[in-house]
Regions:
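Bacterial N-terminal signal peptides
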Residues: 11-20
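Extracytoplasmic copper-binding redox domains, predominantly the cupredoxin/blue-copper superfamily
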Residues: 27-246
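N-terminal secretory signal peptides that target proteins for export/translocation
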Residues: 1-6
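Sec/Tat signal peptide C-region and signal peptidase I cleavage site
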Residues: 21-27
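Sequence-pattern detector for short linear motifs
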Residues: 8-10, 26
């Protein structure tokens, strides 16, 4: 009887631990994509741009100088930097490059890059190029911790990305530091450049929802029909005053 109770307790504990884990990738099927199409476009901003507040540097001021506020970067031709573009609901397509690692560096008391997208099964390499201690604390939107690593100067740590979702990155030593890692179950994601441009390739033909996310301007979705061997143009416009514009 005692052994049975012990086994039941262990099973219950395992169930609780599984429930606490972020959502795992089970739905995406990797195939050889034939006659794949592509989607490209721009993410732009319209309307009056807000004045971004200066970051409050409260510690290690001799090292942490001129840290920019990267929460809203608008480049030439009103292009929006650091928007995440993803295909929603895609269940099969090209393989995830699992040996591909995404680097997140601590440099001049800021995370670099500020926003990136990755796939479940890939890795993020955490670095500290500063001469001071940093931490890299990644938490998903549901507040389940992904990883929390202390990085002394010059230290490197490699962490697997095991679940899909938006991870917000913070440094517990320097509270103004922030970054985002947008993790999807598939490889169809992109980050807009300084001109607001993006591109997705080798997409299986079909109809999809294309979603754009930005930390300050919200989200927007549009339908796209991907045709065999063809390039589709799909542009987005976001407004600081009204949020995402459909």
């Amino acid at each position: 009887m005692k052994n049975i109770k012990t086994k039941l307790m262990l099973v219950g504990l395992a169930a609780v631990l599984v429930a606490m884990l972020p959502r795992m990738s089970l739905a995406y099927e990797e195939i050889i994509v034939k006659d794949g199409g592509a989607v490209r476009g721009t993410v732009k901003v319209e309307g009056k741009l807000p004045t971004l507040p200066s970051l409050q540097i409260t510690k290690n001021k001799e090292i942490c100088k001129d840290v920019p506020n990267e929460s809203l970067i608008v480049g030439p031709r009103q292009g929006l930097r650091y928007a995440v573009i993803t295909l929603e609901g895609i269940t099969k397509g090209k393989a995830v490059e699992r040996e591909s690692a995404h680097e997140l560096d601590n440099i001049n008391c800021r995370f670099s890059p500020h926003v990136q997208a990755a796939s479940v099964g890939q890795f993020v390499v955490l670095k500290n190029s500063d001469p001071i201690l940093h931490t890299v604390h990644a938490v998903f939107a549901n507040d389940q911790p992904q990883f929390n690593v202390g990085l002394y100067p010059g230290r490197v740590s490699r962490k697997p990305l095991i679940a899909a979702g938006l991870a917000k990155i913070r440094c517990e030593v320097h509270p103004w530091m922030a970054a985002y890692v947008f993790v999807t179950e598939h490889p169809y994601h992109a980050i807009s450049d300084i001109y607001g441009e993006y591109e997705l390739r080798d997409v299986p033909p079909g109809a999809y929802q294309l979603k754009v996310w930005h930390e300050s301007l919200g989200t927007q979705e549009k339908r796209v029909e991907v045709k065999p061997g063809a390039m589709q143009q799909l542009d987005f416009t976001l407004s600081p005053s009204l949020g995402a514009k459909k």
